[in-house]
Amino acid sequence: MSDAAYFTEMEAKIPTGKVRTRFAPSPTGYMHIGNLRTALYTWLIARSHGGTFILRIEDTDQGRLVEGATDVIYRTMAECHLNHDEGPDIGGPVAPYIQSQRRDTYGKYARLLAEKGGAYYCFCEKCASEEDTGDFDRADDPCRDLLLEDALRRVEAGEPYVIRQRIPKEGTTTFHDAVFGDITVENSTLDDQVLLKRDGLPTYNFANVIDDHLMGITHVVRGSEYLSSAPKYDLLYHAFGWEVPTYVHCSPVMRDAQNKMSKRHGDPSYEDLKAEGYLTDAILNYVALLGWSPKGELAEQEIFSLDALVKAFDLTGISKSPAIFDKAKLDHFNAVYLRAMSPEDFAKAAEPYIRQSVKGDFDVAAIAALLQARCERLTDIPEKVDFFDACPEYDVEFFTNKKSKTNPEVCKAMLEAAIPMLAALPRWTDEAIHDGLIALAEQLGVKNATLMWPVRIAAAGKLVTPGGAVEICRILGRGETLRRLRAGLEKLA
């Protein structure tokens, strides 16, 4: 097939008529929060417009690839319910969706651009690293002014080369971004970036333009760090005579006011957050609000399901200002989602964490019921329930509590009265234990808390517990409860 026929065929394949977005990660490690936000916004744009969401793997930088990272991408997208309509695993009308499998395409389009005058062959030794280092001075490059036929003769002779973008020496380039508006730059400030490296692989900046065009991408979402490259992308589109997609540049997610989030500095990836006990839905909800806010009647709303986000999402809500990742705020979101779960679903999610500390034959569902309103992260659970298996050593001062009007002497009297009452209960249920303790407090002429405090301390050995004396005693069982209360009484003797 001739190159002309090839280009005609490629253009004919381009889908048209609806919004098409793409998430195009590089398989270089875990899904960091900025990447997850890009995936989410890209997915939301497609879904809110009834469009198509594409997953593309950008693996042209072979030196940075990490084994297994592509599987992490698939797994994360599936867990987050960001289902794609086209991609490497399911195919589609503009396959392949892995850049390393499109190598010939980039070479053909780079050569086409050189024929159009928008690029040139560069044979300089300074290109030997195969990558433009950023200090390239096009004014000093004799290759820029080579006649195309002379350059092609050198290529035919086997001379190593790169293909560089031919940036106009004068004038300005203006591009439009959906977030930042119109931006104009002086062409003299732009470098003749490498498009095709000596090994025949494209640079990121070239491959993404070619792929976005050939895949019919209408909206390109990326970080604001790429704003400086956008005028060069714009010039590439115009040099080919192609329509420019809508750019959506998102400001960075920051660790604090001065520093961007970075895996190198220990900032969490999506998988890290999952391992720390955060729910996927809570993570997505929080990440959606890192740089975007709803408008109108939803302006004060914080909690959004994915379906609700699809209905609410609008590009006008994306902020130019950086967003600061606040773990305390994420804790709040996670707590809301934990409390909204059905008791059955929460118990299922909590059980592995409960079992990290509780090995005995206890009612896991009952323990989970105590926890649901009292934890912000699933990983909080083991420490909260470790007393069920074995009562920890505790200080006798735990029995002193000003609000409950207790001290060691008072608690000794309370336990001396509570032990025989609990031993004599005909049934060991929450209701029976509760009613028995309340009646005993009335009989002793003390506040309920004055009796409940020492019973809970002796039963759990901790100042702070999920649930109170009644629930803890019921789950421990009569025999273990009485054993622990007697041990507490011995401490007070």
Placement of each model-derived feature along the sequence:
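Glycine-rich phosphate/pyrophosphate-binding loops
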Residues: 47-61, 206-219, 240-254, 467-469, ...
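Active-site cores that bind ATP or allylic diphosphates and position pyrophosphate for catalysis
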Residues: 119-249, 255-261, 269, 426
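Charged substrate- and nucleic-acid-binding regions of tRNA-handling and nucleotidyl-transfer enzymes
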Residues: 431-492
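Short alpha-helical scaffolding segments that buttress acidic/His motifs in well-ordered protein cores
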Residues: 286-287, 334, 368-375, 451-459, ...
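N-terminal Rossmann-like or analogous alpha/beta NTP/dinucleotide-binding catalytic cores
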Residues: 2-134, 229-242, 282
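Non-catalytic terminal extensions that flank enzyme cores
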Residues: 1-30, 48-53, 160, 170, ...
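Small-residue-rich helix-loop
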Residues: 343-444
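Residue-level signal for inorganic ion chemistry
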Residues: 42, 73, 113, 117, ...
